[in-house]
């Protein structure tokens, strides 16, 4: 069996070498002519998998080590009888850490109490659902908009106009869809952006085209009260430099790039492939994942909860570092910016998730204990 894999998928050899020969290429270099005699194709979101890529190939299994599948032509794969798998939820915790870090940065800049804001989460799947749990666990008011889920289940959902009217913060976590009852391409277009409340913060860590980038650039240029955090962009790896300059935080599609999330993605696709092959998994993620290096952090039980929240989150991750690196990369010409976008992702430094943090609290500290648990850390 021959396996072709994106070179940025971690631990490919550890998980898949027992199945055969592995060849690796940059994700954007995986094209029809590079498939050779591959039976298995392992990709990330930068590789479009469709008839143009696979027609006439030997590929019988496609695995994407990402939560999204908008880069896969699933109808084509089904028609051809090609098995496929993705990694839903693999990086959910990392994205939540990114959103929390962004909120802290915005609050610090504007002198806002995060507990006083109303949060709107658009898309309550693996990532959005996890974010809702954390925000509500912190005791904050959260409204959720997810029309597909609302159509299938009872729940406390609201429509998008209600979110635009009620919420001070909007965090977008939908897949990118172009068809169906609830397409998400340009879900936030000129009309929706014009209806944002004064002082709204808009965070997009889903897919670039869910927000109309041109319309957002115009909105930010015309309304200085709005703030945007963008991790995803239309036209990646080439981004709108003017739009990035108007954002409070701008990053190169790394919100979910925690080490844990990336390894989890490979492991999920590996397990799906083992199931497709009818063999039990022989490799376990726990055997390969390095122990948490965050260690233990001590907090005075009398500490202010807002200060404690910032301290804990920033002990794990602060997106402002990635923002600074990304802005430096936008100074070159078009080709240099394209290359820099991919290079920042390829050479992204290891980052762990807050789940691995242990927090030692002095005294009873019931409020801080609840805060620590809400974040997903372990109070001791």
Curated annotation (Swiss-Prot):
GO terms for molecular function: 4-phosphoerythronate dehydrogenase activity; NAD binding; protein dimerization activity. It is found in: Cytoplasm. GO terms for cellular component: cytosol. It is an enzyme of class 1 (oxidoreductase). Gene3D superfamilies: 3.30.1370.170, NAD(P)-binding Rossmann-like Domain (3.40.50.720). The active site is at 207, 236, 253 (proton donor). Its main location: cytoplasm. NAD(+) binds at residues 126-127, 146, 174, 205-207, 231, 256. Substrate binds at residues 45, 66, 257. GO terms for biological process: 'de novo' pyridoxal 5'-phosphate biosynthetic process; pyridoxine biosynthetic process. The keyword NAD applies. It holds the Pfam family DUF3410. Pathway: Cofactor biosynthesis; pyridoxine 5'-phosphate biosynthesis; pyridoxine 5'-phosphate from D-erythrose 4-phosphate: step 2/5. It catalyses: 4-phospho-D-erythronate + NAD(+) = (R)-3-hydroxy-2-oxo-4-phosphooxybutanoate + NADH + H(+). Homodimer. Belongs to the D-isomer specific 2-hydroxyacid dehydrogenase family. PdxB subfamily. Catalyzes the oxidation of erythronate-4-phosphate to 3-hydroxy-2-oxo-4-phosphonooxybutanoate. This is Erythronate-4-phosphate dehydrogenase. It comes from Azotobacter vinelandii (strain DJ / ATCC BAA-1303).
């Amino acid at each position: 069996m021959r396996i072709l894999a994106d070179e940025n998928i971690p631990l490919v050899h550890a998980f898949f070498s027992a199945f055969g020969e592995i060849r690796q290429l940059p994700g954007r270099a995986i094209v029809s002519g590079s498939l050779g005699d591959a039976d298995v194709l392992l990709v990330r979101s930068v590789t479009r998998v469709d008839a143009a890529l696979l027609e006439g190939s030997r590929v019988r299994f496609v695995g994407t080590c990402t939560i999204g599948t908008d880069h896969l032509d699933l109808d084509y794969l089904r028609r051809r009888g090609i098995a496929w798998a993705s990694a839903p939820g693999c990086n959910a915790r990392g994205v939540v850490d990114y959103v929390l870090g962004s909120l802290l940065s915005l609050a610090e800049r504007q002198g806002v109490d995060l507990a006083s804001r109303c949060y709107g989460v658009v898309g309550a799947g693996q990532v959005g659902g996890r974010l809702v749990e954390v925000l509500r666990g912190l005791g904050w008011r959260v409204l959720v908009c997810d029309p597909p889920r609302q159509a299938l289940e009872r729940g406390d959902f609201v429509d998008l106009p209600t979110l635009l009217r009620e919420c001070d913060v909007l965090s977008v976590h939908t897949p990118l869809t172009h068809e169906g009852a609830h397409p998400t391409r340009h879900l936030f277009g000129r009309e929706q952006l014009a209806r944002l409340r004064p002082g709204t913060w808009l965070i997009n860590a889903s897919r670039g085209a869910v927000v109309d980038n041109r319309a957002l650039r115009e909105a930010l240029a015309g309304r200085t009260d709005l703030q945007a955090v963008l991790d995803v962009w239309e036209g990646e790896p080439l981004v709108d430099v003017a739009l990035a300059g108007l954002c409070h935080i701008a990053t190169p599609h790394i919100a979910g790039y925690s080490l844990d999330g990336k390894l989890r993605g490979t492991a999920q696709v590996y397990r799906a492939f083992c199931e497709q092959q009818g063999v039990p998994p022989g490799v376990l993620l726990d055997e390969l994942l390095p122990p948490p290096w965050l260690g233990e952090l001590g907090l005075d039980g009398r500490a202010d909860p807002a200060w404690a929240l910032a301290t804990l989150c920033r002990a794990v991750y602060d997106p402002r570092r990635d923002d600074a690196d990304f802005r430096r990369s936008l100074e070159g010409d078009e080709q240099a910016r394209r290359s820099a976008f991919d290079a920042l992702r390829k050479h992204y430094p290891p980052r762990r998730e807050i789940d691995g943090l242990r927090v030692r609290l002095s005294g009873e500290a019931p409020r801080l204990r609840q805060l620590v648990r809400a974040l997903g850390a372990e109070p001791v």
